[in-house]
Amino acid sequence: MSQEGVELEKSVRRLREKFHGKVSSKKAGALMRKFGSDHTGVGRSIVYGVKQKDGQELSNDLDAQDPPEDMKQDRDIQAVATSLLPLTEANLRMFQRAQDDLIPAVDRQFACSSCDHVWWRRVPQRKEVSRCRKCRKRYEPVPADKMWGLAEFHCPKCRHNFRGWAQMGSPSPCYGCGFPVYPTRILPPRWDRDPDRRSTHTHSCSAADCYNRREPHVPGTSCAHPKSRKQNHLPKVLHPSNPHISSGSTVATCLSQGGLLEDLDNLILEDLKEEEEEEEEVEDEEGGPRE
């Protein structure tokens, strides 16, 4: 796929996600081709159309800007707006966020125990799902209280702030005073994080199998540091993700990596390839192409 095709696909996915998958891929693609992948302008024009067509008092609560004339008069945009009616208390926030060009998203950690593969993905808050690149199974994110990786710590005793490898819920000794401190959060890997910013402290924690164990240690605990995991012949996955049970939505969940280490263009190309393979598998099972 060309770079132009990748950009088109990204804009289609963003437009569809703004309206929670209620705009078909075919319609979104046609609009993005017609208006140069301007998902922001088309999204706002759809919201404007909804407000104009709805006619309820509730529409007064929707702050819709007047779109460009060519979009305002476009029949395809008007048709999409009509298909999204009526405006309700339940979908008002969706339309307002689309007007503001917002897609609430979060960085989440995923882990496939079968492949011993760990990755991060930026996903929509409304549908936190990602596919393992190795086995292609879809997974829910690792529970927040079980995440692991580079953690952020704030010592309540000496007020020292530091970073180090850990799993949520497992204490590590403060580099300043030695007081056991629980991690505040796990930091996702990012391109914009300085790779040369290395800690001057060697990792050390109270886990029983830590390669640089701090005493007194806690029996039955396991160190999250990659060096300890490798030295002890343990898998990379500390806590696996639960398999995702599909609800039937077909909107791809890769929106924007936002600085995460994986490249968005490659991810979209992979997703497209996998979607094509899935369609072929369904056709083989059903004995012919789908309409």
UniProtKB/Swiss-Prot annotation:
Keywords: Acetylation, Antiviral defense, Cytoplasm, Nucleus, RNA-binding. InterPro entries: SHFL. It is found in: Cytoplasm; Nucleus; Cytoplasm, P-body. GO terms for biological process: defense response to virus; innate immune response; negative regulation of translational frameshifting; negative regulation of viral genome replication; regulation of translational termination; response to interferon-beta; response to type I interferon; response to type II interferon. A motif (Nuclear export signal) lies at residues 261-269. Interacts with PABPC1. Found in a complex with PABPC1 and LARP1. Interacts with ELAV1, MOV10 and UPF1; the interactions increase in presence of RNA. Binds to ribosomes. Interacts with GSPT1. This is Shiftless antiviral inhibitor of ribosomal frameshifting protein. Residues 51-71, 221-250, 270-291 are annotated as: Disordered. It comes from Homo sapiens (Human). A motif (Nuclear localization signal) lies at residues 121-137. One of its GO terms (molecular function) is identical protein binding. Induction: Up-regulated by interferon (IFN) treatment. Expression increases in response to DENV infection in an IFN-dependent manner. Inhibits programmed -1 ribosomal frameshifting (-1PRF) of a variety of mRNAs from viruses, such as HIV1, and cellular genes, such as PEG10. Interacts with the -1PRF signal of target mRNA and translating ribosomes and causes premature translation termination at the frameshifting site. Regulates HIV1 GAG-POL expression by inhibiting -1PRF. Exhibits antiviral activity against dengue virus (DENV) and can inhibit the replication of all DENV serotypes. May block the protein translation of DENV RNA via its association with cellular mRNA-binding proteins and viral RNA. Isoform 4 does not inhibit programmed ribosomal frameshifting (-1PRF). Does not bind to ribosomes. GO terms for cellular component: cytoplasm; cytosol; nucleoplasm; nucleus; P-body. The gene is SHFL. Signal peptide: none annotated. It comes from the Eukaryota.
